[in-house]
From Swiss-Prot:
Protein name: UPF0178 protein Helmi_09130
PANTHER family: UPF0178 PROTEIN YAII
Family: Belongs to the UPF0178 family.
Disulfide bonds: none
HAMAP family: UPF0178
Originating species: Heliobacterium modesticaldum (strain ATCC 51547 / Ice1)
Superkingdom of origin organism: Bacteria
Amino acid sequence: MKLLIDADACPREVLRTSLELGRRFQVPVWTVASFNHVIASDRHVVVGGAAQETDIKVMNLAEPGDVAVTQDFGLAAMLIGKGVRCLGPSGRLYDAERIDLLLEERELKARFRRGGGRTKGPKKRTAEEDRRFAGALETLLREWNG
């Protein structure tokens, strides 16, 4: 088992927590990001800046039983289909049922924006989200560690 981080848009605290918990539970942590991001990690993979390049590399590295951290619902859907447990940076565990609803919501919002509508941007990250993420990731790693 390994922990895969879609590090392109990953909050710093999520990245720090993931690396720390990976060390504590002796789980290899792979970070994948475009060359625009500098990440200090023993297993950091740098990809080009083309669209979806990070997602493709994460998919290629993923194996059933792995855990992935991403806020990309499309990537999470593909990883779930591959038998990977997916966690969002807010600590939300994505499953097959929930990811379908999230993808549908994303499509509706994109259609609304294409039609000239405006949607709210993301809220500022909170300490509560950091705690929730750390707790959720620790729970997943404990389950794996048995």
